[in-house]
Design a protein with these regions (language model features):
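Metal-dependent phosphoester-hydrolase catalytic domains
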Residues: 3-14, 31-88, 96-100, 212-215, ...
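Structured beta-strand-rich core segments of catalytic domains in phosphoester-bond hydrolases
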Residues: 75, 103-125, 140-141, 150-151, ...
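Active-site-proximal beta-strand elements of phosphoester/diester hydrolases
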Residues: 125-137, 236-245, 273-283
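Residue-level marker for buried hydrophobic side chains located in beta-strands
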Residues: 128-129, 162, 311
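Active-site metal-binding loops of divalent metal-dependent hydrolases
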Residues: 131-133, 166, 244, 314-315, ...
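Soluble or luminal CAZymes and related metallo-dependent hydrolases
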Residues: 144-145, 219, 282-296
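Active-site charged/polar residues at nucleotide-handling catalytic sites that mediate phosphoryl
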Residues: 156
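A solvent-exposed, charged loop/short amphipathic helix patch at secondary-structure junctions
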Residues: 254-282
């Protein structure tokens, strides 16, 4: 009787152990599947982030989709950060994947969202400003007839202002806007991109004499122009004012873009597909034109290493783009050196990005580059400003 009871106990014990092993094996299998799934998702998001970061090295002509990849960089970056938090909390053995992903494109992250110590402007530095003035916002008139835009410019304290969408003849400027503005920035010149009477000129206001100008490149509506500014005896600063190709989105397409970003499921399928395809097509075509314009500007700078340059303007491209990267190959990005944060410069629609940029030759030291939001809603852009002071001699 005792033997039977003992045998039963041993059998029950073996049965219980087998059941526990099966349950443990089942749990292990589920965890392994879960871990591999997390790893796969993390690797996919990291791959997208890296492709987006690398897209700046490829000319968009023939590969327009890569321009879109660059535009999506912040979304992919957010995805990798989310995977980092997720793996830290629930799957720590896979946390190395998003960490490696972030380290692998840390330079691109710095270009997009730089973090720098404060750099107050020293005495005898030059203040530069680049501003897409949207035709000077003529609907906003002051009591004396001057636009609020021109009042803002005259009070900005800038020594040199590069304005885009700023067609304005010197004669009209002096006659219409009074002595105070002329005393502040007594020199002004414009290069027309569209043609006589067009509203998309490139204008420079300066405290120093403008001794020359020429068009560097242009399309039907956009381009870049060189202005030679005499900042001292025998010291010429070559300022290239850029307004690279716009995306030419209609009001309906801009609305569709907002829907794509905020509420992608709200539109009817066929209508949404048509609008989205139109946006993709226009963006891809304009990205190619911007790349060509950036190539022209960068090539001109590279051909004249003995000259001092400032290149600035409305690039219509984010920091992760071929056009911005092309200029950064020959000049220093002022915002990356001394700016902080995303630096949103376009203040309409769903676009929370920096598309206005400012570059200087290596002999200039940059101070306090920032996006000036005090301009309010005078334009659909905020201006980008910085101070510069020469700290090295030009190469012979």
């Amino acid at each position: 009787m005792r033997q039977t009871s003992s045998s039963s106990q041993r059998g029950g014990s073996r049965s219980g152990q087998g059941s526990r092993r099966r349950r443990s094996s089942k749990k292990g299998g589920v965890y392994t599947f879960y871990s591999r799934l997390v790893a796969g998702c993390a690797l996919a998001v990291v791959a997208l982030l890296w492709v987006s970061a690398a897209s700046v090295h490829v000319h968009p002509d023939g590969l327009g989709i890569l321009a879109w990849m660059g535009l999506m960089f912040p979304a992919f970056l957010a995805g990798v950060v989310c995977m980092l938090v997720f793996t830290l909390l629930l799957c720590r053995q896979r946390v190395w994947i998003p960490i490696v992903g972030l380290l692998g494109c840390c330079l691109t992250i710095r270009q997009y969202v730089p973090v720098n110590l404060p750099s107050p402007a020293p005495k005898q530095s030059l203040k530069l400003m680049s501003f897409n003035v949207m035709g000077y916002n003529p609907k906003e008139k002051d009591a004396d007839g001057r636009t609020s835009m021109l009042r803002y410019l005259s009070r900005s304290g800038a020594d040199i202002i590069c304005a885009q969408e700023a067609a304005l003849s010197v004669k009209l400027w002096k006659e219409s806007h009074g002595d105070p503005f002329v005393r502040t920035l007594p020199y002004c010149d414009t290069v027309q991109i569209v043609g006589p009477g067009g509203s998309n000129g490139l204008t420079v206001f300066s405290r120093f004499p403008i001794v020359g100008k020429r068009k560097l490149c242009s399309s039907a509506t956009n381009g870049a122009a060189l202005f030679k500014i005499l900042i001292g005896k025998g010291d010429t600063l070559n300022v290239i004012n850029c307004h690279f190709e716009s995306n030419h989105l209609s009001a309906e397409e801009r609305s569709a873009y907002r829907e794509m970003v905020h509420q992608p499921g709200r539109q009817e399928l066929k209508e949404g597909e048509r609008e989205h395809l139109s946006i993709v097509r226009k963006f891809s075509q304009s990205a190619v034109e911007r790349a060509r314009q950036a190539d022209s500007v960068a090539s001109y700078v590279a051909r004249h290493p003995d000259r001092s340059f400032v290149v600035c303007g409305d690039f219509n491209d984010t920091p992760v783009s071929y056009s911005r990267h092309r200029i950064a190959q020959v000049l220093d990005d002022a915002y990356e050196q001394t700016g902080n944060g995303i630096g949103r410069s376009f203040n309409r629609d769903a676009i929370y990005v920096r598309i206005d940029h400012l570059f200087v030759s290596p002999e200039w030291r940059v101070f306090s580059c920032r996006i000036d939001r005090s301009s309010g809603q005078l334009s659909d852009h905020y201006p980008i400003t910085c101070h510069i002071k020469r700290h090295a001699a030009l190469p012979e």
